Amino acid sequence: MGYLQLMGFGPDGWGSDMLRATGMTVAVASSAFTIGLVFGCLGATASFSKSLALQAAASSYTTALRGIPDLLVIYLFYFGSSSLISGVGSLFGSDGFVSAPAFLTGALAIGLVSAAYQTQVLRGAVLALNKGEIEAGRAYGMGYFLLFRRIILPQAARHALPGVGNVWQLVLKESALISVIGLVELMRQAQVGSGSTRQPFSFYLTAAALYLLITFISGQAFRLAEARSMRGLRRGV
């Protein structure tokens, strides 16, 4: 079977399966990235807290999650949550092992790992703020929320976008690791197809091309966002 027929949309083609798997990859990566952004904001906020306990918690979190291999984190979340569900089920008379939802546990595991990196990105963005503009806003009589919305947030977002874009690329690549817990995303579908047809190169080449396509499109989106955030700023001569 030729490559075009193999990856076609006919009865013997795998094109539809690969496209569905690509959609699943985008969905799980987007979910994990969003989870990471939320927890990253919390981590960055904790790192600037006056409470030494919160500062220590944020530092310990980022150190631990960046130090443990991502695959191990996925296994811990998947089997840990499955054991918890099975234990709860046994209390109500259910016997046997109950698997946790692969999408949910995978997205949560990757999201919390990415949060460790996003915490550092967001913390660096806040440290790069123009303190003079913040002091001027306070002198003008701005309240905290107005100051945050008009001065702090736009500047922090501008500084954070490049780093956040890099974290997105990391999350996209890490989404392939979720294949080990059975979620049929792009990498898993390539494994299934290559095993069924004994043409692994064709499937892995197609998967690589689709990953690159997602990377290119998302990279363009982040570049447009960066360009938009820079509008109205004077460039140094």
UniProtKB/Swiss-Prot annotation:
Transmembrane residue ranges: 24-44, 72-92, 96-116, 201-221
Family to which this protein belongs: Belongs to the binding-protein-dependent transport system permease family. HisMQ subfamily.
UniProt KW keywords: Cell inner membrane, Cell membrane, Membrane, Transmembrane, Transmembrane helix, Transport
InterPro entries cross-referenced by the UniProt entry: AA_ABC_transptr_permease_3TM (IPR010065), ABC_transp_permease_HisMQ (IPR051613), MetI-like (IPR000515), MetI-like_sf (IPR035906)
GO molecular function, one term: transmembrane transporter activity
Native organism taxonomy: Bacteria, Pseudomonadati, Pseudomonadota, Alphaproteobacteria, Hyphomicrobiales
Protein's organism: Rhizobium meliloti (Ensifer meliloti)
Limits of the ABC transmembrane type-1 domain: 22-222
Source species, domain of life: Bacteria
Protein topology in the membrane: Multi-pass membrane protein
Principal subcellular localization: membrane
UniProt name for this protein: Octopine transport system permease protein OccQ
Cellular localisation: Cell inner membrane
